[in-house]
């Protein structure tokens, strides 16, 4: 029979093992249920360009601009990013607010009680130097996913052009004299435009842990020919699909950096059209690397280099490789998109831009994109959109009518054709 001393030692060992096991179980359970820390991530963005005509050229004076943006992911707080990148003089924002829209009440109206001020270093106003940018303080506001948010800016002083802007917003902006940043009604904002001014991003704070995905593209990404005020760009459909289908709701933000007419090789200014923006390489730093939480870039440029610049396949491929190299150096995942069909596209009424010779360049580029090991993945928009009976043409039901830009249904088909596993981060890849 064991001595009392031996029994005490045995009991102490049993207790130690039991407590240790309990701690191990508790630690394991704690790891399993520990919430992802909140991080800032881009939910919406717009690529900005130098001024063109109208308001972008003339500027503003003692006026309010109310703009609407469509989120991809939601969050518990928000902040806005503003830019005076192409301005030649300081830009003063006298008052900025965020709110939920209330379109059933009237054009430009806001949901009562939803308007919140956006401060800058604790101040109501901010002055942004020429070529500069600003980020607001965090705004305590629940931001829903895949929903519109109203951003209202009041410009108190004479603000001459050129105004940094985005030409084809596909969203109505409302403009009026005086400070109406906190007004829930749009009644005094009677002037309308289809542009975004100075506003380049909306960030949210959330726990997705998936960061953001930037799409560097042209007019197809920009949503040209989609329904105005309906948010039917392929990136909008993709954002909504990810929110719905991503495991545990952990969707990345989708940031649209599309510019109509944009090219890999040349700027819009080379055509005398500033609002087409800088070429893809020149704007890569601002429009991709400058985004909040960016982890992946989708390259969706090249078709304008085929028909507008009439560049060679070798040059187009070299430019895509250059962009991929820039992304890799920044630690980003790189996905490319094949160039979609464009047979019968007219560059002007009665002027058919398409030729089989030019299309052979597109096909050569696509062959490279499908087979190259230079990228982390390929989205085959050519295969998704082409007419099986005539592969050089868009499917009729997805053609907006100009034979190069997909309609709303075509944009939805593009989003559905994307394998989501290309876009979602594995747990072991997260920071």
Where do the PLM segments sit?
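N-terminal secretory targeting modules
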Residues: 2-216, 221-230, 247-249, 426-427, ...
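Conserved SGNH/GDSL esterase-like catalytic core that processes O-acyl groups on lipids
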Residues: 44, 66-67, 90, 98-105, ...
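Active-site-proximal beta-strand/loop segments in catalytic clefts of secreted hydrolases
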Residues: 83, 154, 216-219, 256-262, ...
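Structural motif
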Residues: 88, 194, 205, 289, ...
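Sec-exported extracytoplasmic/periplasmic mature domains
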Residues: 221, 239, 243-247, 289-293, ...
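Proline-centered loop/turn at the N-terminus of a beta-strand
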Residues: 253, 333-335, 377
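Catalytic His-Asp segment of secreted/periplasmic serine-dependent ester chemistry enzymes
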Residues: 271-273, 340-429
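Active-site segments of SGNH/GDSL-like serine hydrolases
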Residues: 300-307, 324-362
